Design a protein with these regions (language model features):
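Short, glycine-/small- and polar/acidic-enriched structural segments
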Residues: 4-162, 185-197, 202-215, 377
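Extended ligand-binding regions for polar small-molecule ligands
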Residues: 27-29, 96-114, 218-272
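Internal, well-ordered alpha-helical segments in soluble enzyme and binding-protein domains
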Residues: 146-149, 171, 175, 189, ...
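Conserved C-terminal helix/tail region of periplasmic/extracytoplasmic solute-binding proteins
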Residues: 314-389
Length: 389
């Protein structure tokens, strides 16, 4: 194949769809790009290979792009995100034993995140009183949306995620096995691994993350700033190929074809039926077959999901500050926002953006607390009594 050769890493997750479809459907080739996709297992591998130049671009968890750019937790390598690969798509899954305990302790409908969170607080307190080990939850990386989503849900209901439970890092493909082996009591991960746990009869999906935050930037197409400066035309072509892929994925007429593509062993490696449920936002949430639907479960191209939103970057930085991963600084806040580049998206796709109807006014839509002001992180932090500042 002739074209600009690029090496791009990805994790087997549904929100890699735009990248995978861009290659497998030929949109990248039509843009003059010869992309080698490299399937990885952990976010640390992805980050390190992007940072040192082994990868030209990557399917990257959004907070990692920010942390790398700010030099948090690792070497400082400025990263740009000209395209958002997915908004939402995570879920919180728990073991049958923990699900039963939460249901028994709940004062109301556990589909309400506040009800389930307060029930979790009671279960955690009961375990502590009996001298038992704390509940353990898996998340994918310290600088991850999964970490922040678990913490936001728990802390809003007075569960201290550092004192009342344990949070441990696990690669996404290993979450299900860890739950089956009782190494964890629950986890937060992206699709399709929550559905895989339910289908195996070992997990209950407690919440879609879209029930906790109406709009949460999840993965981005990450490139090194230096690479973007050296390859502006290639970057534009790469974003255009992803834009075509996102539109193709969101067309219901293409769902069967897309599901089959993503199900391939060298892509995500699960059944096409599980992928189709994910794309449709129609998931079995219990081994017995109970189904929950949400049009917001995973947004790839709808509702301006692919356009990077600096407000989302500001919210992620605020979580880093809240949980002691970063100092509070106007310079760091500005640096975090600068990672998300809607100007590059617009330059590539030539679209004039306007607010989408039905989207949260603060661009976040959290289930608890005041609205988020991207220019006043101090007020956001002051609203919460649990944190590690």
């Amino acid at each position: 194949m002739n074209g600009e050769k690029l090496r791009i890493g990805f994790i087997p997750l549904a929100d890699a769809a735009a990248l995978l479809v861009a290659v497998d459907k030929g949109f990248a080739a039509e843009a003059g790009l010869d992309i080698e996709l490299v399937r990885e297992v952990s976010w640390s591998n992805i980050r390190d290979k992007l940072n040192v130049g082994i990868f030209d671009a990557a399917h990257l968890i959004a907070p990692v792009a920010i942390a790398s750019s700010l030099g948090l937790g690792h070497i400082k390598v400025p990263i740009l995100a000209p395209f958002c690969l997915g908004v939402n798509g995570n879920a919180i899954t728990v073991s049958p034993t923990l699900y039963a305990a939460i249901a028994a302790a709940a004062d109301g409908d556990i589909r309400d995140p506040m009800v389930s969170g307060r029930a979790l607080a009671r279960v955690a307190a009961q375990r502590k009183a009996r001298g038992e080990e704390p509940l353990t939850f898996g998340m994918t990386f310290p600088f991850s949306t999964h970490n922040y989503h678990l913490r936001f849900w728990m802390a809003a209901a007075d569960v201290d995620p550092d004192e009342d439970v344990r949070l441990v890092v696990l690669p996404p493909p290993y979450m299900v096995e860890s739950l089956a082996n009782k190494h964890v009591d629950g986890f937060c991960v992206g699709a399709p691994w929550n559905s895989v746990a339910v289908d195996l009869g070992i997990g209950f999906i407690l919440h879609f993350v879209s029930e906790i935050l109406a709009r949460a930037a999840e993965k981005v197409l990450g490139v090194r700033s230096a690479w973007a400066e050296e390859n502006p035309d290639v970057l534009m072509r790469l974003v255009r190929a992803h834009g075509r892929a996102a539109a193709f994925i969101e067309d219901p007429a293409n769902r069967d074809e897309v599901s089959a593509m993503l199900a391939a062993p060298n892509r995500i490696g699960v059944t096409a039926e599980v992928i189709r449920r994910t794309l449709d936002g129609r998931l079995k949430v219990a081994p017995g077959g109970t189904v929950r639907t949400s049009e917001r479960y995973l947004l790839v191209g709808r509702a301006q999901a692919a356009r990077p939103d600096p407000v989302q970057a500001a919210w992620l930085y605020a979580q880093m500050v809240r949980w002691g991963q970063a100092p509070l600084s106007t310079d760091l806040l500005a640096g975090a926002k600068a990672v998300f580049r809607p100007d590059l998206y617009d330059a590539a796709l030539g679209k004039t953006q306007s607010p989408s109807a039905g989207e949260p006014a603060d661009h976040i839509g959290a289930f608890a607390g005041p609205g988020f002001d991207a220019n006043d992180v101090v007020a956001h932090l002051a609203a919460w009594k649990i944190g590690r500042r």
